[in-house]
Amino acid sequence: IANQKDGCTLLEITEALDIPKSSAFDIVKTLLYKKMIVEDQNHGKLKYKMGINAFIIGSGNIERLDLVEAAKNQLIETANHFNATAFLAILDNKMVTYLYKYEAPHRIVTNANIGTRKPIYSTALGKCLLAFQRKPEVIKDILKEIDFKPLTEYTITSPQKYLKELKRVKNIGYAVDFQEDSIYQICIAAPIFNHNKNVVAAISCTFLYDTNLRIKEIGEEMKRIALTISKKLGYIDDTGRRNIHGK
């Protein structure tokens, strides 16, 4: 249907898919219900064209591809520099969803891959994606639905402590997960913003737990890299005054 400017008739769909007309009708009916396609009778024949929801989904995927393209080279360079595993993630249905992953040659092995979904409260990525939301009600609504189950002995399980942690993250401009999601792992993340200054993603590097890890230095570097990526997405830095990256 998407490839036909004037849309398709039910017969054309049936022939293209090589399925019974009744089966094609069931598919069309479902797509109409989901607003993925719409009916068009302008030319005397009933045809089906792409609907608004198909456009919205397609646009969302394009934005995600643009996001990965903007961040990819920076993440590869950063992971190799720190000998770490780098991630790019977004907030999707109140879960952290990984869009991109790069592992340096001698990196720490992680169980997260592209498409993996993790709780927002146990990851540094999640902290960034929530702490920098511009509307306080968004944070409150998400916090209400979080079931703070301990994933390790270090997981924050108190809504009050987590809210305090979010305030700290917003103040310093980056987030740290101290073995809160996976034991023996530390994750350091920073937020990515779009042209409207909305947080749209976050990047992170994962390290093996080490008391000598230079967390502040790495955090500042992650902020710098995230800012570079944000500018590729049209974000304009507020030079000369405190900006949303905590500077």
Model-derived regions, located:
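Conserved segment of winged-helix/HTH DNA-binding domains
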Residues: 52-79, 110
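Short, highly charged C-terminal tails/helix-capping segments
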Residues: 235-247
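N-terminal helix-turn-helix
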Residues: 1-64
